[in-house]
Amino acid sequence: MLFGRETSLKVADQIVGSARDAGVNFIDTANGYAGGASEKAVGKLIAKDREHWVLATKGAATIGPGPFDRGISRKALTKFLDDSLQRLNVDYIDLYYLHKDDEHRPLEETVATLGDMIRAGKIRHWGLSNFRGWRHVEAIRIADKLGVPHPAASQPYYNAMNRMPETEILPACTHHGIGVVPYSPLARGVLTGKYTPGEKPGTSSRAGRGDRRIMETEFRDESLVMAQTIKSHAESRGMTAGAFALRWVLHNTLVTSVLAGPRTMAHWKGYLSALESGFTEEDEALVNQLVPMGHPSTPGYNDPQYAILGRPVRPYA
């Protein structure tokens, strides 16, 4: 996500090289990251050994003001994919996610388009990102109806501050054989413990910039206190808070892989360190005490980018 924007190509190359040396072969980007610059950077970084990498990218997020600069229609997705292939400088993409749902649009056209992309050899598999549990099942039903392969992976926002995917998304994916690849295991940086309760965040941070998605979800004093509790516990175990948070996600047997978004080599090494420590029953109990299974860290935790649709009201008297 940060490659091509906050992370220079030189540093990104060092991170990718270190990842490859550590046995990593799965790399993820999106057409909307850094205005397309992230895809261009990833394409350059994997060009010398393309076949080593399982390459994932995403389409459907808003990238401009035009009517087909967003959404999951055939016309929009076709343009998104062709542009991604060009920026990545590849002939095919291993895993192509729908980055965002459009719950007001029937999925038949979308799934049929993805099937055509597979038959054309432009993508190998498709997946869903930020889709609700019932929409996963609907996508599978339509895929069966149209003779299209099932989605191979789901990319939910899942971490110790947001355990809501445990109620529907993760069980549904497991039941239907869909891999689960959570993003933002550090809860947009909150789980690193870098934010101090009661103190104004740094201007260069996501919270300091007033990003609505963090301000209306994790950035509340209760959550920041929880993050500090996790940080203290992790340090008593000889781990960083970030490594603990990543390890917590990976300890869930329903999780297939996890996305790391390092900005620096130090960040990347911090992610890798999560694999060096075990996870104990006491570790699990601590998080359960702070954030119960299936719940977010605080009441009213709603990502403004994904509206709650379960209460349309009748006309008032």
What are these regions (language model features)?
Residues 203-232, 236, 254-255, 265, ...:
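Terminal-tail/helix-coil boundary detector
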Residues 12, 27, 42, 55, ...:
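Conserved, mostly hydrophobic/aromatic
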Residues 165-205, 240:
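Aromatic-lined glycan-binding groove of carbohydrate-active enzymes
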Residues 1-54, 119:
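N-terminal binding-site loop/beta-alpha segment at the start of enzyme catalytic domains
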Residues 16, 39, 43, 81-85, ...:
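Generic structural signal for well-ordered alpha-helices
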Residues 4, 21, 64-164, 168, ...:
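Glycine/proline-rich, positively charged
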Residues 59-61, 132, 158-162, 184-191, ...:
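Glycine-rich beta-alpha junction loops
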Residues 52-64, 155-156:
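A short, structured active-site edge motif that brings together acidic residues
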